[in-house]
Amino acid sequence: AGLDYETATSYTLTLNASDGVNTTSSDLIITVEDVNEAPSLSNTLAASSFAENIATGTTIATASASDPESQTLTYSLSGTGSEYFAVDSSGNVTLVAGLDYETASSYNLTLSASDGVNTTTNTIAISISDVNEAPSLSSSLAASSFAENTATGTTIATASASDPESQTITYSLSGAGSENFAVDSSGNITLAS
């Protein structure tokens, strides 16, 4: 066991010297100087994985740090994607911006605790789970209006859809009069027979 200023700031020892008959003693006072030591740091994830659609403000992890000299600690985050998260003065790591699994399925952030002199770091590994999102859909008419004698098979409009999870898109039509039109697997809407 080494010296620890936080445990004892000094030691008073008695040094004895003996020749077998006579003993001489002298007091030794050993002073221990304080050295600013790095804080200790640990963190706990709130869950093993987080859905990409979790609300901003959700607590992702909680950090716990202590300083041997009882100095005030400040927390910070760094690393790719750290702009999506924030850490407060209590060590709570929260989500501050929306996540997208298709952009990043995980984040490895560096959590730091500093006493102003020394800094300790820890890694927070955050796993993101996919949520099946609705496809995006756009359409454009081939013309602003069509004559009542427009030929069967004439393209009326074109639809375009894409799915964030790259799933197969299926088109369909509904509503009053939809039986007068057909849509194929490419999104071409034509006049039906």
Task: Name each region found by the language model.
Residues 1-38, 48-58, 63-136, 144-153, ...:
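Acidic, turn/loop-rich segments in luminal/extracellular domains of secretory-pathway
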Residues 45, 141-142:
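Type III/flagellar secretion export determinants
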